[in-house]
């Protein structure tokens, strides 16, 4: 079965980027090569590849990747012919000269330049460079729940002014309910003259429902990952997303049978542990803390005899964001100290 009409919604498959969080950034070149062939066969429009935190993020602080950026991108490029190769770029991790230029030289087609939801200013140079090189470039606002709707709209306007061709909001901690998504996507549609996209996490079990709410509110770019493979409780499951959109009559251009096959294959290859909405995932969603914190929080809390739920709620009170993993140990020590008094 195929959904071959002109896509009404363009889906980005983040399996090989967000999914890297689920395996501590240890996806191998062979995993990337094999999965890209399946995604290509399913006619997935955009396949995003890289370290979980994006280009040049491999580090002791957020996790060392099994493969270099160059190896990951070269491998993917070799196997993607019609599907476009995408990357996630956070200024601060990736510089234009040292990281972005070499990535584009390797054949990247789509660049998603991301910032915290109130810091769009840092994306200007990266977005401008991508536009100058003739690449498709989207602006991304991470942890979007941390900004009020008017602030989110103002940040989106900046991305548009810098040259972004669309603005994608990320529910990085999986905290949204469908009404939250509808309000934000609708407001963005009214505020900017470019496309709006949405990236879901499943911490409260709402990834598919939230993605559909985004589309109904006018989003034209939606992210998903095979088997929901991603940080924390995972992302919107790509196969389910395609099936539901087919049921709704929304064209994606993705072959349903082949994406189902891709899911079966990925589960035998590298999705060794299927995403589950566990207790900590729910707490992550409620506290509004980045899903990727789940593993380090659990590990550090366990090592120190501290309840990881307390750690999440304290991180939420401190408005911790991705890249601030060093806060976890600080919070754990503080909670442990209070408990010993």
Swiss-Prot record:
Sequence positions that bind substrate: 17-18, 172, 199
InterPro entries for the chain: 2-IPM_HCS-like (IPR050073), 4OH_2_O-val_aldolase (IPR017629), Aldolase_TIM (IPR013785), DmpG_comm (IPR012425), DRE_TIM_HOA (IPR035685), PYR_CT (IPR000891)
The enzyme's E.C. designation: 4.1.3.39
UniProt keyword Secreted present: no
Positions in coiled-coil regions: none
Location of the active site: 21 (proton acceptor)
GO biological-process terms attached to the record: catabolic process; L-leucine biosynthetic process
CDD domains xrefs: DRE_TIM_HOA
Catalytic reaction equation(s): (S)-4-hydroxy-2-oxopentanoate = acetaldehyde + pyruvate
Pfam families: DmpG_comm, HMGL-like
Binding site for Mn(2+): 18, 199, 201
GO molecular function terms attached to this record: 2-isopropylmalate synthase activity; 4-hydroxy-2-oxovalerate aldolase activity; manganese ion binding
Keyword Manganese: yes
Domain of life where this protein originates: Bacteria
Span of domain Pyruvate carboxyltransferase: 9-260
Record-annotated site: Transition state stabilizer: 17
Alphabetical keyword list: Aromatic hydrocarbons catabolism, Lyase, Manganese, Metal-binding
Homology family: Belongs to the 4-hydroxy-2-oxovalerate aldolase family.
NCBIfam families noted in UniProt: 4OH_2_O_val_ald, PRK08195.1
Protein name per its UniProtKB record: 4-hydroxy-2-oxovalerate aldolase
Organism: Spirochaeta aurantia
